[in-house]
């Protein structure tokens, strides 16, 4: 029924509310303002795929930073290089992905479009319903191994990192990080020598998260037996000899000695030796001397240490087998790593790299025990470590003698940062040689001469590199790049040819022959600071003409350098001949003779002495520079602040002290230049003096410009 007209108009519609006084103005402003652009997509993962592999490995910024630190980059540089790599990947492949997906924009769903914004080539990304998996897909790009290596090497070059085989080193570090290979570092040593501190710092430096102590293995084994049943397992290593029977130990030692004498006297009479062994088996110990001399307390401490170590080493053997099957890198430290048992482990496990940690000075060793006791004292009544210090030192003497016999590198741990830097450089050098197909353990000699040689080369390289700073120079009228060590007076200690065109910092093999014939007596017209992997330890990789690993060059290469007594001019040869007519060869041999030869290492020193070197010589050896900043566990925010501060203050300089020392020396060197110009210093060589002052003036000029030079964008 239609509504009457009066009913329809009885309730007129309410008038619209009065407009707000500022409504039109706000509306006009919103109409004029465009919607804010969507935030750029994040890049959290770089999936690196090999041609033959079916699965890609995801790199995050912290993982890439740890990989760069493993290959020897400084922590602050590793942080900034990883940031630069992710920025380059994001900018390059974001533009490429936009052009690739423009053709399929009409047919592709919006979700798939968002997923492919960051992927240059998506394999077959399934749109999962799990939010986290979808988020990872949206923030991941997939690149080839070659492209990834190229971007990282370019970033290394932008931060002035040069190396003889930089690309191969990064690829080796990637294989360790991706668990395609593994390494097992063993830190042997007695109580109180700093093994636990070294292992934790070394794990942070190498990016190894698994750090195991043999004490934890012993504690685990204690849960399966009672103290009354096995008191030896519940004792500490330095007084484990108290749980042994002195008479039984003396008889066992006499029996072993008699067997050795029998083998020496009858080396080829196998049949007669079998009959003798049968007779001994029937008579038991009746043929032993009736009055066996008892051994002393120190020897009993060593025998107790060996007995407890033998109990722990079997469990460690099974653990290392499991780690190698899983390709898991690990650091093992502990007093139970007796060198005899370590050599047995190396026969079965090729991933092991051993080191012997010790404290040469007994007073410093005792001071370490003062903070470990319940009461901070050196009183033997209240400090059990001081009470058994004789046993602890006896065990250390035994381990040092065995290390000399098996050529295991010995680390005098007077400075933790220096020890970590030396071990880090040695471990990576051993990984290079293992990658080349060499075996670290020599089965014929029962030694690890390769590891010992690498450690000696690292020490020699650090001694050479600490004399100056690293510069990338060019001679006047030449286009060849040279990585040189410059002294503060402008002279060149040593130089190597660098092929800068390939972007990887590789050596130019065609120019190595010329370097031995044309030492650097000429002036140079260009110089810029550079960085080396492992700092001054990294020079060990430059000791060969071919740019290979450090084993191709040795300490003999350093001895044969043409170094004059005055120290003004130095040879630029990459690897000098074994025989040299330089007048300072004898002096250089004296400097490096402290390392000892392999023949000397086969003869262990007397048990009553710690070493054949004096404390002053040890202190001189231990003056080393760390290869990586010790504050390697800083957060991203702290590294951002550090990066800004590093760019503004230091330019290309890698350390604050390096920049400060250069500016400090500048004023002193300028005074020397003016004094020489006024005639205070007279040189008989004429033109040689002019070349020297030209190099010195140019070096000071370049050092002043270093602080004003800015790093590339990080």
Curated annotation (Swiss-Prot):
Gene3D superfamilies, per database record: P-loop containing nucleotide triphosphate hydrolases
Bias kind Acidic residues: ranges: 595-617
UniProt-listed Pfam families: AAA_33
Biased composition range(s): Low complexity: 1-11
Region entry Disordered, spans: 1-42, 259-293, 595-689
Tissue-level expression: Expressed in roots, leaf blade shoots, leaf sheath shoots and panicles.
Biased composition (Polar residues): 659-670
Compositionally biased intervals (Basic and acidic residues): 271-285, 618-636
One of the GO biological process terms: myo-inositol hexakisphosphate biosynthetic process
Phenotype on disruption: Strong reduction in seed phytic acid with a molar equivalent increase in inorganic phosphate.
Function noted in UniProt: Required for the accumulation of phytic acid in seeds. Phytic acid is the primary storage form of phosphorus in cereal grains and other plant seeds.
Protein name: P-loop NTPase domain-containing protein LPA1
Species lineage: Eukaryota, Viridiplantae, Streptophyta, Embryophyta, Tracheophyta
């Amino acid at each position: 029924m239609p509504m009457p007209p009066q009913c329809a108009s009885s309730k007129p519609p309410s008038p619209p509310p009065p407009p707000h006084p500022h409504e039109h103005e706000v509306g006009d402003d919103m109409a004029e303002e465009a919607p804010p652009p969507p935030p750029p997509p994040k890049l959290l993962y770089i999936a690196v795929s090999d041609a033959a592999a079916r699965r890609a490995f995801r790199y995050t910024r912290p993982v890439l930073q740890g990989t760069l630190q493993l290959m020897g980059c400084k922590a602050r540089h590793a942080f900034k290089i990883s940031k630069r790599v992710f920025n380059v990947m994001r900018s390059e492949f974001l533009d490429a992905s936009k052009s690739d997906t423009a053709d399929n924009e009409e047919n592709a769903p919006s979700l798939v479009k968002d997923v492919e914004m960051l992927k240059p080539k998506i394999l077959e990304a399934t749109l999962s319903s799990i939010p986290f998996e979808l988020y990872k897909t949206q923030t991941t790009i997939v690149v080839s191994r070659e492209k990834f290596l190229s971007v990282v090497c370019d970033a290394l070059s932008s931060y002035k990192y040069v190396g003889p085989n930089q690309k191969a080193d990064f690829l080796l570090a990637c294989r360790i990080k991706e668990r395609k290979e593994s390494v097992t570092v063993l830190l042997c040593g007695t109580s109180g020598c700093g093994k636990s501190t070294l292992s934790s710092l070394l794990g942070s430096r190498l990016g190894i998260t698994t750090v195991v102590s043999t004490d934890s293995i012993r504690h685990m084994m204690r849960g399966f037996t009672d103290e009354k049943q096995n008191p030896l397992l519940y004792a500490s290593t330095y007084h484990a000899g108290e749980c042994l029977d002195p008479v039984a130990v003396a008889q066992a030692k006499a029996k072993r000695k008699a067997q050795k004498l029998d083998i020496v006297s009858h080396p080829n009479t196998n049949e007669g030796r079998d009959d003798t062994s049968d007779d001994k088996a029937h008579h038991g110990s009746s043929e032993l001397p009736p009055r066996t001399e008892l051994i002393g307390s120190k020897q009993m401490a060593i025998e107790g240490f060996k007995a407890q170590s033998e109990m722990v080493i079997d469990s460690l053997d099974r653990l290392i087998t499991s780690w190698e099957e899983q390709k898991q890198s690990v650091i093992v430290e502990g007093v139970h790593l007796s060198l005899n048992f370590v050599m047995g482990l190396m026969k079965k496990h090729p991933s092991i790299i051993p080191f012997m940690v010790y404290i040469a000075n007994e007073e410093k060793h005792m001071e370490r025990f003062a903070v470990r006791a319940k009461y901070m004292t050196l009183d033997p009544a209240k400090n059990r470590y001081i009470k058994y210090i004789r046993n602890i030192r006896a065990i250390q003497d035994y381990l040092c003698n065995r290390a000399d016999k098996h050529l295991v590198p010995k680390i005098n741990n007077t400075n933790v940062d220096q020890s970590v830097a030396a071990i880090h450089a040695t471990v990576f050098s051993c990984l290079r040689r293992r990658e080349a197909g060499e075996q670290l353990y020599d089965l014929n000699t029962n030694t690890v001469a390769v590891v010992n040689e690498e450690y000696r080369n690292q020490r020699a390289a650090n001694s050479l590199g600490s004399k100056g700073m690293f510069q990338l120079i060019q001679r006047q009228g030449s286009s060849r790049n040279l990585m040189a060590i410059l002294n503060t007076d402008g002279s060149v200690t040593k130089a190597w040819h660098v092929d800068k065109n390939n972007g990887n910092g590789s050596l130019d093999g065609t120019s190595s022959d010329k370097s031995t014939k044309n030492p650097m007596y000429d002036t140079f017209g260009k110089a810029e600071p550079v960085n080396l992997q492992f700092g001054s330890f990294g020079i060990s990789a430059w000791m060969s003409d071919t740019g290979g690993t450090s084993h191709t060059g040795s300490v003999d290469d350093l001895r044969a350098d043409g170094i004059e007594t005055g120290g003004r001019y130095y040879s630029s040869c990459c690897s000098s001949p074994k025989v040299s007519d330089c007048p300072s060869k004898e002096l250089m041999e004296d400097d490096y003779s402290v390392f000892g030869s392999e023949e000397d290492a086969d003869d262990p020193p007397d048990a009553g002495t710690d070493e054949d070197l004096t404390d002053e010589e040890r202190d001189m050896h231990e003056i080393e520079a760390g290869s990586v900043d010790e504050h390697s566990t800083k957060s991203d925010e702290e590294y951002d602040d550090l990066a800004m501060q590093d760019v503004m203050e230091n330019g290309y300089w890698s350390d604050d002290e390096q920049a400060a020392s250069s500016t400090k020396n500048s004023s002193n060197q300028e005074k020397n230049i003016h004094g020489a110009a006024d005639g205070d210093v007279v040189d008989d060589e004429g033109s040689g003096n002019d070349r020297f002052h030209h190099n010195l003036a140019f070096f000071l000029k370049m050092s002043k410009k270093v602080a004003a030079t800015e790093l590339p964008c990080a």
